[in-house]
């Protein structure tokens, strides 16, 4: 019973938090204050991928260890093919 009440309160809190932090498209980024300004800047960074700091990371060179699980097109290797080591692209 207590766990159910806690879960209901948590869901209501998270729902309210979603509505409070939602960005109003009628407001421009210059009128945003506090948390709204922070969320607006984060959303603008996702729209403009060149502004993202995640794009600044480098890639792993060919024949270097890239991970345990083999995933094709993982983006970790410069050649985009990782099978325990970065595999160079076929000519």
Swiss-Prot record:
It holds the Pfam family Conotoxin. Its main location: secreted. Transmembrane segments: none annotated. One of its GO terms (cellular component) is extracellular region. Belongs to the conotoxin O1 superfamily. Disulfide bonds join 59-78, 66-82, 77-86. This is Conotoxin VnMKLT1-021. It comes from Conus ventricosus (Mediterranean cone). SUPFAM superfamilies: omega toxin-like. Residues 1-22 form the signal peptide. The keyword Cell cycle does not apply. Coiled coil: none annotated. The presence of a 'disulfide through disulfide knot' structurally defines this protein as a knottin. Keywords: Disulfide bond, Knottin, Neurotoxin, Secreted, Signal, Toxin. It comes from the Eukaryota. Residues 23-57 form a propeptide. The keyword Disulfide bond applies. It is found in: Secreted.
